Swiss-Prot record:
InterPro entries attached to this UniProt entry: Ribosomal_bL33, Ribosomal_bL33_CS, Ribosomal_bL33_sf, Ribosomal_zn-bd
Coiled-coil residue spans: none
Name used for this protein in its record: Large ribosomal subunit protein bL33C
GO cellular component: cytoplasm; ribonucleoprotein complex; ribosome
Entry-linked NCBIfam families: PRK00504.1, rpmG_bact
One BP annotation, GO: translation
Lineage: Bacteria, Bacillati, Bacillota, Bacilli, Bacillales
Protein source organism: Staphylococcus aureus (strain MRSA252)
Keyword Ribosomal protein (UniProt): yes
Keyword field: Ribonucleoprotein, Ribosomal protein
Molecular function terms, GO-annotated: structural constituent of ribosome
Pfam families xrefs: Ribosomal_L33
SUPFAM superfamilies from the UniProt entry: Zn-binding ribosomal proteins (SSF57829)
Length: 47
């Protein structure tokens, strides 16, 4: 398992690091709280 950073879709801020198994082809998307936007937004896996 690797730690993958998640970027906020709205502002691009890196807010979270989540574990992800290696070998999965799809990119992770989660709805999380962004303190900079002060709202729940979609966070996508960054490279």
């Amino acid at each position: 398992m690797r730690k993958i950073p998640l970027n906020c879709e709205a502002c691009g801020n890196r807010n979270y690091n989540v574990p992800k198994q290696e070998g999965t082809a799809t990119r992770l998307t989660l709805k999380k709280y962004c303190p900079k936007c002060n709202a729940h937004t979609i966070h996508k896996e960054s490279k």
